[in-house]
């Protein structure tokens, strides 16, 4: 998985475990795609300080994932649901309407 995409996905799961400042900087960098210089200017700090904060947060998010595996479990669940739905559609000729209904119900589990 590409690092930037992986960190963005980890933010979805673990951002509430970061401080408000960390969440803000990470959102500006990963979601809003601002440069380190732009974020530093907004936070009235140095580019190096922002770089260090982002790297620390990246490590922290990866550490949370290595312990809790929420992203991995979610991706495994998503894959299982998609495989199950495809099998259901192929074996039992499920209509597109029913397929979407089943998909929605399974995703809400």
UniProtKB/Swiss-Prot annotation:
Source organism's superkingdom? Bacteria
Matches recorded under Gene3D superfamilies: Winged helix-like DNA-binding domain superfamily/Winged helix DNA-binding domain
Task: Give disulfide pairs as residue numbers.
Answer: none
Record-linked Pfam families? UPF0122 (PF04297)
Return the similarity comment. Belongs to the UPF0122 family.
Q: What does this protein do?
A: Might take part in the signal recognition particle (SRP) pathway. This is inferred from the conservation of its genetic proximity to ftsY/ffh. May be a regulatory protein.
- HAMAP family per the UniProt record, alphabetical: UPF0122
Q: What is this protein called?
A: UPF0122 protein CLL_A1244
The species is Clostridium botulinum (strain Eklund 17B / Type B)
């Amino acid at each position: 998985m590409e690092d930037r995409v992986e960190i963005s996905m980890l933010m979805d799961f673990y951002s509430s475990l970061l401080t408000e400042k960390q969440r803000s900087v990470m959102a500006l960098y990963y979601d809003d795609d601002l440069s380190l210089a732009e974020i530093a200017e907004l936070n009235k700090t140095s580019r190096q300080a922002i770089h260090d904060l982002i790297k620390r947060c990246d490590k922290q998010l990866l550490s949370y994932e290595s312990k809790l595996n929420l992203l991995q479990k979610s991706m495994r669940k998503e894959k299982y649901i998609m495989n199950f739905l495809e099998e259901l559609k192929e074996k039992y000729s499920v209509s597109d309407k029913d397929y979407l209904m089943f998909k929605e119900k399974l995703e809400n589990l």
